[in-house]
């Protein structure tokens, strides 16, 4: 069952189409990463999905309803890119205030513990760092036990420890049957969390499917090995002391290199990471 979907959505700002015939859906218990370069239409897609903008063509649905319906909005938790808090309220007070808007919120102490907010729980919001404000904002998206969480760049400005706490909370949410849609520029994050990737470029969906399929669509394997400066190969890229090859068949490439007498010190043969697959796709 889809908990959220866009159906053939077109959204224009003046003569520019921010979204052009965009469709995708999110199922129960699914983590979907919405990826694309700056200006691709990701934020507009989120705004339409959440009922914050109305498309000229197409529709958005949350739990089968209009996304502006209170019954639908109560089941969604959101962290936008930009978020502000009353500067004199303390972190614990903000968590309590947000939780009071829901019938069955997560206990305050549970949320504080999950997102490691204990050290800042007594501090005023106006004195928080950017990363601390971000962590609080992400935590609040989970306060009402939502069935769908939408996170726009959730771990931007977070350190490794704080990012790990957010990842753990996301995994727990999904284990409990919740769905999650995130945008991120940390492709390692998408790779660690998402089972499915929706790739948007210039307002259109150019790929929608399992992460493994996106990598396979690049049609290439990475072969990397240490090579002295005097060794150069056709289609190989220099990477410091190493050469990198993107090839359809890694095993065959290694055999060919050995037959050609190329020394393969510090050899690495592996599938592309998400970052490498996207770069390979853009380069054709």
Q: Which residues does each PLM region occupy?
A:
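Conserved ABC transporter NBD signature motif
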Residues: 57-72
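Short, charged/small-residue-rich alpha-helical element at the C-terminal edge
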Residues: 219-284
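Helix-to-loop junction immediately C-terminal to a conserved catalytic motif
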Residues: 50
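Conserved ABC ATPase "signature" region
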Residues: 96, 100, 105-120
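ABC transporter nucleotide-binding domain
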Residues: 166-248
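Catalytic Walker B motif of ABC-type/P-loop ATPase nucleotide-binding domains
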Residues: 149-153
């Amino acid at each position: 069952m889809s908990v959220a979907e866009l159906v053939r959505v077109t959204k224009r700002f003046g003569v520019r189409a921010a979204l052009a015939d965009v469709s995708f859906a999110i199922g129960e218990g699914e983590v979907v990463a919405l990826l694309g370069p700056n200006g691709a239409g990701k934020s507009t897609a989120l705004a339409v999905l959440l009922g914050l903008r109305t498309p000229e063509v197409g529709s958005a649905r949350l739990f089968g309803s209009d996304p502006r319906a209170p019954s639908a909005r109560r089941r969604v938790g959101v962290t936008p890119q930009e978020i502000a808090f009353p500067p004199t309220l303390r972190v614990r007070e903000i968590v309590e205030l947000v939780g009071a808007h829901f019938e069955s919120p997560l206990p305050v102490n549970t949320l504080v513990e999950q997102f490691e907010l204990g050290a800042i729980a007594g501090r005023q919001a106006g004195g928080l760092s950017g990363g601390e404000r971000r962590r609080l904002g992400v935590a609040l998206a989970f306060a009402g036990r939502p069935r769908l969480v939408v996170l726009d760049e959730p771990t931007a400005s977070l350190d490794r420890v704080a990012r790990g706490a957010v990842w753990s909370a996301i995994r727990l949410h999904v284990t409990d049957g919740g769905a999650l849609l995130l945008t991120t520029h940390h492709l390692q994050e998408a790779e660690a969390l998402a089972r499915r990737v929706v790739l948007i470029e210039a307002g259109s969906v150019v790929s929608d499917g399992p992460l493994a399929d996106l990598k396979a669509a690049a049609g290439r394997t990475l072969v990397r090995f240490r090579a002295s400066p005097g060794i150069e190969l056709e289609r190989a890229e220099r990477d410091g002391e190493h050469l990198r090859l993107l090839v359809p068949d890694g095993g065959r490439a290694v055999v060919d290199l050995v037959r050609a007498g190329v020394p393969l010190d510090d050899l690495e043969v592996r599938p592309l990471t998400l970052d490498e697959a996207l770069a390979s796709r853009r380069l054709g």
